[in-house]
Each structure stands twice: as structure tokens, then as C-alpha cells.
Amino acid sequence: MKRTITVLLSLLVCSAAMLLAQDSSSKPSDAAEMRQEIDQLKKMVADLQARLDAQDKAKAQQQEQQAQQPAQPTTAAAQAAAAQADLTTSVQDLERRMLKSERDAALSKVRFSGDYRFEAHSIWGNVPNFYDGMQLQNLMVKTLFATAPTSQGGLGMPFDPNIMSQYTPQQYAGMLNQLVNHNYGTYQAYTNQLTFNNLKQAVGSMPPQQVSALMNYLQGATYVPGYKDDTNILYTNRFRLKLDSKLADNLSVTARLSMYKAWGDSTGVQVFDGQPNSLSIDGNTVGTPNSDILRVERAFFTWSKIGNTGLYLSIGRRPSTSGPPMNYREDEPRGGTPSGALIDFQFDGITAGYRINDRTELRACYGVGYQSGFGNGDILELPQDRLKNTHFLGGNFDIYNSEKTFLQLTIARAFDVTDGFNGLTVMTNNPLTGDVIGAPVVMRYTPSANLGAINLIGVNFSHSFGPVDAFISGNYSGLRPNGITTPFGGLGSDPFETPTNHDGGMVYVGVRYNLPQNDGRTKFGFEFNHGSKYWFNFAQAQDDIIAPKTNTRGNVYETYITHRIKSRFILKLDYLKYLYNYSGSGWHIGAPKSLDAAPILGFPTYDRASMLSLGMTTRF
């Protein structure tokens, strides 16, 4: 029994220690109540000890009687047992309450917030007349197969230039297809060992005039008349959960989980149609409709006030999406660090910054866009054949940031850029041979070459003039190729061209009127952006269903109305109109083609498109 008392006293002491160590964020009323209960328990233990002492004395006087007859529980013993049971129950209840208090205190250190958004879209698109570049490449490969020596896997048939005057392009294409069908095994063996370098060498061995004449001739068999591409209705769900935890005065952790999907589709993989948002890559998994999987959009720690200065360090999956001025049309605060007109792209990296004062902040940023040494079969390649990592290095300078005025400079350079990024997609054609893939399957796309560097510079300025918010964004891009091309092309060039430097630009302006009659709950906005022929930015995660609007090589007009039905319940009506001047918007590879005349396109593209959207967003 005394051992039980000792255990109970130990529990009582531990409970008291736990209370004293309780986080300062616990409610004062809970702590006071528990202290009162501990005092009561102390008194109960003292009373129980007195009863046990009396019981021991009674036992000593009755030892002879207990030796002569079976032991019977005394009244004192029964009372002591009852008291022990009551005390044990009280201590257990106290432990449960203290554990709950500790749990509540821990949860109070993590702040949860987020939003859910429903949208309904109607899309109208127009594809202009074009020549199918994938089919053209396929006819070229089949011609090379027919004329290649048998020692190289071909059929060894001489090429007669006069054939171009004897048959129409369609007839010649039919003859080639029939020839391949009759020699399909040989053709498969030929294409299985074919590389892009082999293809370039074969084309390069032909007289330039003959290549040009053959391409022009074959082109006639690949013409596709323009057509409409409309989607009457498309529904989407987006859910985002944000977690913030302050671990110390100068240390915090932030994360955001996101789910974004189209109704009726959770595959997470799209059929590749030539648009930059149809390839699921590390940079856009939550910026375009994907699946019902909750993905980590951002997760990083921030160590601030290092050495009691304005210096800070932040490492992790960066807040690099929805940066200014993209937040105006969503009626929400700044969502990301870099300019959204230049970079709207998820990536992992490091930021070292210095807060000069309350209005001025300087940041140096580093990130990785492609990691060659993991998951890409490096060990299967000789060292000289392995790709280099794609690194991002940049600076972000918030020159002046106040409640009404914002001025920002963003500079970035991407080193050793590859022909795309690791991703998942469903390819309908082999990009090397142009052959149709009979049973399209989900495949991992892995880059094949480093193509050069890309430079980006952007300046954002915004100001509030009473009920009117306005912004202007000026941006520059520079493609700096290293001379290498792939089946998709080089930096700003087609596969069989020699890449050269190209510069591009984009201007983006917007104005928003906050209706003063209802305290700005209703907002009317208009935005316009224009991109030049060789304009490129990293905006694959930009949340525009058709395509990221700031990618556009041409003009985009957007007008919208947002209305806060409640402070955290927002209704939005939006209309977007795209007018494309050149192909390849959103791509750093391939030469832009004017859409005024029927161009050769690897994949169909819009010359104009529009979208009407209705959305409802709840925030918590």
C-alpha cells in the first residue's frame, strides 16, 4: 500500500512538473483549475497517509486474532482501498486533461488556412490552316529508309528527282506507306537504330537544293485545313491547404498542399497536344488540372534576423507561383516572391535575403530545374554523354513596397537548359520518326540534350489611386543557344537549323476599379499583355486553362468582375481572349512561325481562342 502511495505521489509530482512546463499559450483558466485540483489531490494523499498509519496501528493490536482466524477486511482497510481507487481515478483524469492541454498547445503553434475554388469554363478555339510537321518528318524518314544502302538497314532504292513531277505528293505518300507496309520488319529495324544525329547526317549528305525541293514536294501531302476546337463546358475543383508554424521568434516553417482537377478526370497525365501545359512536369503539377492527389506545392523554412540583422535564409520548395502582378485578377494578396510575369513555376531552391528596411528587400535565389543524376539512367550513359543539371540563379529586389506602391526588379538566368523537363505524358507520335504510336501509353519524358542558357529581366510597378489599382510590367527574354538541336528543335530554332541568339519582350498592363459604394467588395478589372516573336518565360504553372496567358506571342485581353458575397466567399466572372501572332508560345525550343499563312507545325496551335469562366472561391 505504501508503494502505491509512493507511485501516486510520483505521478502527482510529474503532473505538477508538466503543468509548470506547460506552454505559455495554454489558457490561464485551464492552468488555474489544474493547480486547484493538484492541491486537492495533495490533501487527499495526506488524509490517506493518516488513515494508513491508523490502520497499521490497528493491525498490530489484532495480530493474534488474525493468526487464529481467517483475515477479514477491516473498515479502515476498506475505506483506504476506496480512497486509493478514487485517487487513482482522479490522477488518471488529470493525466488525460493535461495530455489534451498539451495537444491543444502544440496545435496552437500551427496555423491552418486555405481555400476551395469551383470554376466552370466555356472555351472557343480556332486552329488555322497548317502543314502537319510530324507527318512531314515521317515521310522524310520513310524516303531515307527507301534510299538508304542495305548496309545501313535501308532498301537501297535510288532516288529519282523526276518522281516529283510524275506523281502528286499524295500519290507519292501512298507509295511510301505501301512500301513500308510490305517491308515493315526491315523498317522497324531501321527506325529502332535511328538516332537524331543519324537523321541529320543523312539529310546533310543530300544536296541542299534537293532537300529543299523534296521538303516542298512532301509538304503538299500534309496540308490540314483549319477547324474549330470548342469545349462547351469544363468544370474544375481546386483545394489548397496552407500550414504555418512559428518555431521561434526567428524561425518558421510554411507549406501549402494543393489539389487541382477537372471533373471526371483524375489520371494526372494528359495527351500531349503541343501546348506547354499538356506535359506534367515538376514545375506545373498544381498549376494545371492534374488529379485528386494532394501535392506539395511549397514547403520551406525561413531563418530570419540572423545575427540580429536583416539577413535571412530560406530553403525548400519555393513560393515561386502567383507572384505580382498576377494576384490582382484573383482579388488576393501577393502569392509568390518573383515576378509572375517572368516566373510562375514550381521549383526547389534556396533564397538568401536582406531586409534593408520595412519597404526595401533584396534576395538572391538559386534553384534546380532538371536533376541529371537521379532517375534518368545516368549509369547507363558514358560520362561524356550525360546531361548537365539545369540550374537557376536570380535576384529579386523589392525596391519599394508600401500599402499603395510597389516597385520590383527580377533578374534570372537558367544555365544548361534542356529540351524540356522530366515529366509524364501520353505521346501520339514518335517525335523522331513521326510514326503514329498505335497504342498510346503513359510515358516518362526525359530530356536528351543541353541547349544553352536563357536570360530573363522584368520590372513591375503598381500603385493605388484611391479606388483604382493599376500596374505595368516590362519584361525581356534572351535565348543563348550552344548550337545543339534535337527532334523538337534548339533554342528558338527548328531541328535542322543552326541556332542563333534571339531576344524577346513582353509588356503587361492592368487596371482594377474597387467599387466604393460597397467598400470595394465589388471589383472591375481589365488586363492586356503583348509578347513578341521570340518571347519566352517560365510560366508553366500559371492557372489559365487554355494556356498561360503571359506566354503568348501575340495579344491577350482579359476583363473580369469579382464580388465578395462574404468576406471569405468570392464570386468571379472572367473573359479571356487570345490572339496569337506566332506559333510556339510557351516553348523555348523550335522556331516561331507566323500564323498569317499556313505554317509547318509539329502540333496544331490556336491562332485565336477565348474563354468565359464563372468561379466561386471560399477561403478559410
Question: What role is predicted for each listed range?
Answer:
Residues 109, 227-374, 390, 394-409, ...:
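Outer membrane beta-barrel
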Residues 8-16:
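Bacterial N-terminal signal peptides
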Residues 73-75, 128-223, 266-285, 337-339, ...:
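Solvent-exposed loop segments that connect transmembrane elements
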Residues 20-230, 242, 620:
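N-terminal periplasmic/intermembrane-space "pro-region" immediately following the signal or transit peptide
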Residues 225-228, 409-620:
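Outer-membrane beta-barrel pore domains
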Residues 1-8:
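Bacterial N-terminal signal peptides that target proteins for export
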Residues 102-133, 139, 243-259, 263, ...:
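Hydrophobic, aliphatic-enriched repeat segments that assemble into extended interaction scaffolds
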